[in-house]
From Swiss-Prot:
Organism field: Rattus norvegicus (Rat)
Expression across tissues: Detected mainly in brain and at lower levels in heart and lung (at protein level). Also detected in testis but not in kidney, liver or spleen.
UniProt feature, compositional bias: Pro residues: 1-30, 165-200, 207-243, 260-275, 293-312
Family matches, as PANTHER family: CXYORF1, WAS_WASL-INTERACTING PROTEIN FAMILY MEMBER 3
Biased composition (Basic and acidic residues): 417-441
Protein name (database record): WAS/WASL-interacting protein family member 3
Post-translational modification Phosphoserine, affected residues: 150, 208, 394
Residue positions of motif Profilin-binding motif: 3-8, 11-16, 20-25
Domain description: The WH2 domain is found in a number of putative actin-binding proteins.
Cell compartment(s), UniProt: Cytoplasm
Quaternary state and interactors: Isoform 1 interacts with WASL (via WH1 domain), and monomeric and filamentous actin.
Length: 485
């Protein structure tokens, strides 16, 4: 390292011949005035460097200069011997060289990305202005004779060096355009993402359409209709079906009101219509499961009161219904009980399994959920009117869907936060539970009741007194009985 210091002294003289080109840049003249002016010029140079660096890959040349910047540190040391010039070089030269080393190490490689131009420009300014100075001596070392250059000459050399980098930069801008084009490529990537969203909607419809054909394969819609015609009221009920389906898609709450109104005159039609919206709503998308759950619970309450008279008619139609729409027959079978033959419930699950197989993977989940919803609410609705009824139905529901209950209940619990527990789950009647243990009054001593005494043996005395006191026992027993009741 001691060898490089000698070459720096010749550096100041060569710049004068090169002074002709530098004059065009404005920063040159102010630099020669004073040290503060040097700082201002440095700021201006930084702005220019930032603009130039943003334009293109100028730092690649800087990398070459930065490789030679190591001697520049010694040059600052050597000039320090000279005098005033040392201050200017030491201020700017002490920090930038390290940055120059860092730039030489990794920054130029990262530059091409075009993202760090601004950050690199701020830090790279110092090395950029300082680095060219070594290059000048290398070119004009032939004239090292005037080695004893005054500090002003050194300043002039700095001015020329700072101005010198500017000419090479104009030559460099040619490469910058290639770097600027890369930014345009990034914009094209954003357009590809938009196509993706369209693809997702396409996927959603693709999932939904296959479901309806599967539903259409079994003659679910036509079969129950013949069962309904015999009744006089059914004609008014079919019109509500389409609005119900539309409402189920839009908002379930409005649907509940129309369902409650029509069911009173024709209880039977309510079940098939109630099944239809479910079928229509299922194909729409599994995402609507959240909306569907609230709909089923309210309708079930109306069916329980009328079931006895209409059940036989519905039972007569139940064979077709059981084959066509699986969900409606299940509640019908559970309600009819002895009226319908036992094999019907097994048929419905078998058909459900067949139906679940053709449907896409997303469909079977909602079907199971809907089935559970209809069963659970039916049992809950029955429980609302007569408490003893639910226990009779609960075993049927449990037998018909042992495997489906746990998952369905969990899913319903996650989805129905608004509904009551009775609509979600099947509960046992009070008779099913064993009676609570009889209350047997015993000796109870409460410290608050005991007379306060500062003697240490007060507790023992209190216990003895409590055992003999019957009034406290009777009070405690009465209070506890009231609390239990």
């Amino acid at each position: 390292m001691p060898v490089p210091p000698p070459p720096p002294p010749p550096l100041p003289p060569p710049p004068p011949p090169l002074g002709a080109p530098p004059p065009p840049p404005p920063p040159g003249p102010p630099i020669s005035t004073d040290a503060p002016s040097l700082r201002k010029s440095d700021l201006k140079g930084r702005s220019a460097l930032l603009a130039d660096i943003q334009q293109g890959t100028r730092l690649r040349k800087v990398t070459q200069i930065n490789d030679r910047s190591a001697p520049q540190i010694e040059s600052s040391k050597g000039t320090s011997k000279e005098g005033g010039a040392a201050g200017s070089n030491a201020r700017g030269g002490s920090t930038p060289p390290a940055l120059g080393d860092l730039f030489a190490g990794g920054f130029p490689v990262l530059r091409p990305a075009g993202q760090r131009d601004v950050a690199g420009g701020k830090t790279g300014q110092g090395p950029g202005s300082r680095a060219p100075s070594p290059r000048l001596p290398t070119k004009a070392i032939s004239g090292p004779l005037p080695a004893p250059a005054s500090p002003r000459l050194g300043n002039a050399s700095d001015t020329h060096s700072s101005a010198r980098p500017v000419p090479p930069r104009p030559s460099v801008p040619a490469p910058p355009p290639p770097t600027t084009p890369p930014p345009p490529p990034p914009p094209p990537p954003p357009p590809p993402p938009p196509p993706l969203p369209p693809a997702s909607p396409i996927k959603a419809p693709s999932v939904s359409p296959p479901v309806p054909p599967t539903k259409g394969n079994p003659s679910a819609v036509p079969a129950p209709i013949p069962c309904v015609p015999p009744l006089p009221p059914p004609p008014p009920t079919p019109p509500p079906l389409p609005p119900a389906s539309a409402l189920s898609e839009k908002a379930v709450r409005p649907q509940l009101a129309p369902l409650h109104l029509p069911p009173i005159p024709p209880p039977l039609p309510l079940l098939p219509p109630y099944g239809y919206p479910a079928l229509h709503s299922e194909p729409s998308s599994p995402a609507q499961d959240v909306r569907e759950p609230p709909a089923p619970p309210p309708p079930p309450p109306p069916p329980p009161p009328p079931p006895p008279p209409p059940l036989p008619t519905y039972a007569s139609c139940s064979p077709r219904a059981a084959v066509a729409p699986p969900p409606p027959p299940l509640p019908g079978s559970s309600n009819s009980g002895s009226e319908t033959p036992p094999p019907l419930p097994p048929k419905s699950p078998s058909f459900q399994t067949q139906k679940a197989l053709p449907t896409p993977p997303g469909a079977p989940g909602p079907q199971i959920i809907l089935q559970k919803k209809r069963r659970g609410p039916g049992a809950g609705g029955g429980k609302l009117n007569p408490p003893p009824a639910p226990p009779a139905r609960s075993p049927t529901t449990e037998l018909s869907s042992k495997t489906q209950q746990p998952g369905g209940q969990l899913r319903n619990g996650g989805q129905h936060v608004i509904d009551d527990f009775e609509s979600k789950f099947t509960f046992h009647s009070m008779e099913d539970f064993p009676p609570p243990d009889e209350y047997k009054p015993g000796q109870k001593i409460y410290p608050s009741k005991v007379p306060r005494s500062r003697t240490p043996g007060s507790w023992l005395q209190a216990e003895a007194a409590g055992q003999s006191s019957d009034d406290i026992k009777t009070r405690n027993s009465q209070l506890s009985l009231k609390a239990l009741r």
